[in-house]
Amino acid sequence: ERVRKYAETNIYGFDFDPDLKKAARMNMVMAGDGHANIFHVNSLDYPNWEDPNELEKIKASIKKSLDKMQDIDNNYTDDARGKFDMIFTNPPFGAKVKVEQEIAAKFFLSKYSDAPEVLFIEACYKLLKPGGKMAIVLPDGILGNPNTLPVREWILENFKILASVDLAVEAFLPQVGVQSSLLFL
């Protein structure tokens, strides 16, 4: 019961794919930790999400969570930016994933790349509390490609790198063939 209450109050999930949202909720129900706070939104477009109903649900959920926490360091707004202690994310990456130009333009890092995995780094940074932690799956190209040096420099300016874990090529879908790492910031 304690785990379920904690999950309902403190754990949030956002996904652009409505089927993955449903799968996550079902997984939570089966694990016995509730099914609240899983939303179908484009994480890169916060706070201008297309579905105003989802945005209102998120605002209400954050407000409920803040009311229960009684966190005196928190400014008690329903804006999600700066509210998360930890973020765990596996952003979409690959040639098929495109970000609309008007969304990409919101991000400083779009000067260097409009790839969603690059923009997710900055989007998550904006959602974290000062001192918050993040674990993000990234293609190794970001970590070693000479063209992404400005992105790595931005990461170093804004985060402390805690660990980088190489993942097996088979870690995700078979035959995807993208070498990736789990970066702890």
Give the label of every model feature segment.
Residues 160-170:
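Conserved S-adenosyl-L-methionine
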Residues 179-185:
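Conserved beta strand-loop-helix elements of the APE1-like EEP
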Residues 1-157, 161:
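SAM-dependent methyltransferase catalytic region
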Residues 170-176:
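AMP-binding (ANL) adenylation modules
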Residues 5, 176-179:
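A short, structural micro-pattern
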